[in-house]
Amino acid sequence: VLAEPMGRNTAPAIGLAAFILQRTNPEAVIGLFPSDHVIANPDRFREVLADGIQIAASGENIVVLGVHPTRPETGYGYIEAGSLASGDALRVRRFTEKPNAETAAEFLKAGNYYWNSGMFLWSARTLAGALTEHLPKTAAVLEKIAADYDTKKFPATFRRLYPKCENISIDYAVLEPRSAKGEEESNIFCLRADFGWNDLGSWTALHEHHATKQSPADGNLISGQGIFTLNASRNYVHA
């Protein structure tokens, strides 16, 4: 476990792992998985990951897991899917970060947009190369830090140099500029995250996670004993 001396968003964090791994195993496939997600079907999740690892391991490919949207959500980024590449993999046309409500509604209606789950697969070499191309100053810093890994100098080097990294997400640093090359050139592929995904980052998401076909018509979800509702709808009550 590498604990950052300070938060610099996702690009430096995952980038450092890539530069460290590249020194010993450049073809190692790295997975990025946020910790606040719920996966309802772990077996299907593992199947999708196995497919994604194969794609990420063959060439300079980046794999993103996309979730079929169920509402015009403005709190998630979106993936515009293009042509079918092979198997279940779709080529990615572009990424859009957290659109306004009108744009999100247009994406939902279009039918070829997916929520960006924030889960990615790529080889250490591919990610290190992408950072060097699109975020060269930060990549140079990360490479210097990685050079001292497994030495006594590493903790001091890490603390001294890491704050020099740009504070930027992997989406803005790599995915958006890379997708701008076009779906045939970017080598970014989307696999459908059809394994019961939910990001518990909002009350709406929490409500959806606990809702079932047997949920009451008023939309109230109640967890606990002795709880009664009056003239209330679409509430989540836990006591």
What are the functions of these language-model segments?
Residues 1-84, 129-135:
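Conserved beta-loop-beta/alpha segment of the NTase-like Rossmann-fold superfamily
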